[in-house]
């Protein structure tokens, strides 16, 4: 982002002229790709999702509860602004990323034995569902993403609270320990 500011004197889309779809500046396209990768990393979407299961498994439950929701919702809010003023190529890329995130998240969760790793892969799938709301860009998409975000907030906080309590009482970490 500092390169964008240094080259164009600002970070608004009017300064950069990225939203008109006519840019042929390959350096600008490369920088935009790097910014996109940064946001995909922030919201834990595929293919930038490989860090999520390890962090969720190793970190304390209250920290994981925070990381599972708030950075994802903040990144999605920024993504809404980015997609609204971008060209169609970015939208197509986000559609592919959302589908890959949903598939990778669900298939990865299916194979897990550790409950926190399973929820990590579930979080990757949730990122894909939120990205679908972004690229649909109809009159209800922002409201749907906001509603989904509220549900994600309460369900993830509730799930990690239950995991925290049960892991303290029963020393449970694996899925079979919770049965």
Feature map (PLM): residue ranges:
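Alpha-helical transmembrane segments of multi-pass membrane proteins predominantly involved
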Residues: 1-179
């Amino acid at each position: 982002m500092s390169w964008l500011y240094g080259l164009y004197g600002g970070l608004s889309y009017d300064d950069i002229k990225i939203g008109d779809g006519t840019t042929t500046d390959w350096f600008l396209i490369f920088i935009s790709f790097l910014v996109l990768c940064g946001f995909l990393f922030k919201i834990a979407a595929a293919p930038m999702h490989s860090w999520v299961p390890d962090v969720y498994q190793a970190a304390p439950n209250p920290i994981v509860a925070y990381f599972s929701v708030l950075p994802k919702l903040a990144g999605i809010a920024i993504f809404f602004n980015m997609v609204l003023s971008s060209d169609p190529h970015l939208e197509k890329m986000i559609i592919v990323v959302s589908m890959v995130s949903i598939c990778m998240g669900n298939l990865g969760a299916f194979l897990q034995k550790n409950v926190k790793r399973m929820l990590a892969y579930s979080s990757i799938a949730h990122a894909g569902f939120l990205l679908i709301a972004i690229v649909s860009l109809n009159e209800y998409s922002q409201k749907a993403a906001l509603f989904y975000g509220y549900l994600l907030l309460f369900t993830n906080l509730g799930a990690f609270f239950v995991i925290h309590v049960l892991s303290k009482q029963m020393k449970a970490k694996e899925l079979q320990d919770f049965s």
